[in-house]
Amino acid sequence: MFSVRIETLGCRLNHVESESLAALFLQEGFAVCRGNTSTAPVVLCVINTCTVTSKAEQKARRLVRLLLRTYPTAIALVTGCYAQLEPASLEAMDDRVLAFPGKQKDALSLLPSCLRALLVQRGPAPIDQYVCGMRALLASLKKKIISLELTSEFPSQTHMPTRNALPQLTGVPHAPRVSVSSFSEPTAVPRFALYAPRFLFHSRASIKVQDGCNSGCAFCRIRFARGRAVSLETHEVIGRVQALEARGMSEVVLTGVNLSQYRSGSIDFAGLLELIVQETHTIHIRISSLYPESVTSAFLRAIAHTRVSPHFHLSVQSGSDRVLRRMRRAYTRADIYQAVSDLRSVREEPFLGCDIIVGFPGETEEDFADTQRMCKTLRFAGIHVFPFSARPGTEAFAMDAKVPQRIAGERVAAMQQLAEKNYRAYLEYWNGRELCAVVEQSVARVLTENYLSLPIIERGGVAASAGSHVRIRVHNEGAILL
């Protein structure tokens, strides 16, 4: 059997989608690897990319080149946000690179069965002939899919195309024959088709409940790559969580581009949380990220339940009202302070994280001082800081008053020092206390309910497998299983 290598860059959404694709390839009998670990011949490399910063794009190009060198006969299928916005530049890298649009990424759920059908019918043909046929199949699939519209309708088995609806391979010299009809179905590309019932690369399950964004932040072009906000219907979310719970999963992470824009009929994200808690029994629920405006009274009621992990990552970006206005953010510094106060009023010392952009055009020393002061005062235990990266097509790309890279780098370093100090203080607060935790993939570490990643320093005879829920006591910078 052949192998497929899957590599993922960027956000949790990308990781969820890659896990889903990996599960589908395994289901069709392919070996799946991440990293250079495969013993079977690798015929396809899937690279799920990010476009948040120019460095993310550079990393994607380096990875593509590495994979092309490592696997001289394999196809590099590049998808994700970078592939959506810059397909031509990626495909110009090599004839073996095919950029599959990120907006239609859910259509890749068809790919494993397509390639399995091709493999079954190729007979004893050499690997290069199979790869040739696969390249033609991928190109045909892409051509058909990009002409279709997107829909938020959940893909039922009758809605999804089957192996009898695969693209016809024509004009491919020496390609194995594939006796299939033209790709006449479906009339739309179903969103949320990439759903992982099992997880190969992570110990914790994740579900994508929302995609896209309707906001117009000056620095971000993810909305161009992923499109308008769309949500998975509430009953489908609950069904997927219940299925994970039935399989013994101890935790699920709910993720999306902008969870504050989740809507299913009259149900918003707070309502979704309430319903999940009501309709499940043991599984713990973690939220990937939040906007300050998401912290409403209804949301606070929902997170008061002990099965909602006390870990909240806020998309903050700046502590300066002036910079927030230039960024076109929909909240003020006062809103951030209020959101943090409200979260702490409901849960005891939750882990609070935030995203910070430094060096945004026009950011002064006073603006940066406001951001530092905010992060110090609010005691954010996790600070994800990165320098502003001008993205083509965004309002900020053409803004004047650019901050020199040297100054932006100094501000990044200063914020990282503060982040380390805040984290140490938070870890010290919980030292000696008991917490719930999930055993990580390596089984040598745990991730606590409040997002402390700790090495297991004493097992106490407790048998703990990856993904299992355990009680631990924090001891200095480690965990003792109870």
From Swiss-Prot:
Its cofactor is [4Fe-4S] cluster. Its EC number is 2.8.4.5. Residues 199-425 form the Radical SAM core domain. Keywords: 4Fe-4S, Cytoplasm, Iron, Iron-sulfur, Metal-binding, S-adenosyl-L-methionine, Transferase, tRNA processing. This is Threonylcarbamoyladenosine tRNA methylthiotransferase MtaB. Transmembrane segments: none annotated. GO terms for molecular function: 4 iron, 4 sulfur cluster binding; metal ion binding; N6-threonylcarbomyladenosine methylthiotransferase activity; tRNA (N(6)-L-threonylcarbamoyladenosine(37)-C(2))-methylthiotransferase. Residues 2-120 form the MTTase N-terminal domain. It is an enzyme of class 2 (transferase). It catalyses: N(6)-L-threonylcarbamoyladenosine(37) in tRNA + (sulfur carrier)-SH + AH2 + 2 S-adenosyl-L-methionine = 2-methylsulfanyl-N(6)-L-threonylcarbamoyladenosine(37) in tRNA + (sulfur carrier)-H + 5'-deoxyadenosine + L-methionine + A + S-adenosyl-L-homocysteine + 2 H(+). [4Fe-4S] cluster 1 binds at residues 11, 50, 81. Pfam families: Radical_SAM, UPF0004. It is found in: Cytoplasm. The gene is mtaB. Signal peptide: none annotated. Binds 2 [4Fe-4S] clusters. One cluster is coordinated with 3 cysteines and an exchangeable S-adenosyl-L-methionine. CDD domains: Radical_SAM.
